Amino acid sequence: MPTYSPKAGDVTRQWYVIDATDVVLGRLAVQAANLLRGKNKPTYAPHVDGGDFVIIINAEKVAISGNKRQDKLIHHHSGHPGGLKSRTVGQVLETRPERLVEKAVKGMIPKNKLGNAIAGKLKVYAGPNHPHAAQQPVPFEIKQVAQ
């Protein structure tokens, strides 16, 4: 009997919703990245997009451990000379909390075409509401919360 190799058409996808309230950002990102890649499934293969859809709600209430809220800087560049912009994690969390969570999760998936397809299945919302009720997402609980 030959070894089973999953194909793109063999995948059945499920929708998960994760509440980010009082969950440490890194632990949230690890769990979300594993669900997106399909590492929780017995048919996991690194060359196939076999993961599930992940909805993260309450991104504004995510926990940041240590002094990272005021000490850690997030950089981006406009592309023009002298166009390096820097903001602290706390500033980003106040203005666009969904971007902070997206950046943390996308940093844990591959940086290639497959990674872009995987990142497309991530939906992040700052508040408790999301427009994906028709997909009947299953709640996914992260047991380790911040003290």
Curated annotation (Swiss-Prot):
Keywords: Ribonucleoprotein, Ribosomal protein. GO terms for molecular function: mRNA binding; structural constituent of ribosome. InterPro entries: Ribosomal_uL13, Ribosomal_uL13_bac-type, Ribosomal_uL13_CS, Ribosomal_uL13_sf. The keyword Thylakoid does not apply. Gene3D superfamilies: Ribosomal protein L13. SUPFAM superfamilies: Ribosomal protein L13. GO terms for cellular component: cytosolic large ribosomal subunit. One of its GO terms (biological process) is translation. Part of the 50S ribosomal subunit. Belongs to the universal ribosomal protein uL13 family. This protein is one of the early assembly proteins of the 50S ribosomal subunit, although it is not seen to bind rRNA by itself. It is important during the early stages of 50S assembly. PANTHER family: LARGE RIBOSOMAL SUBUNIT PROTEIN UL13M, RIBOSOMAL PROTEIN L13. HAMAP family: Ribosomal_uL13. This is Large ribosomal subunit protein uL13. It comes from Nocardia farcinica (strain IFM 10152). The gene is rplM.
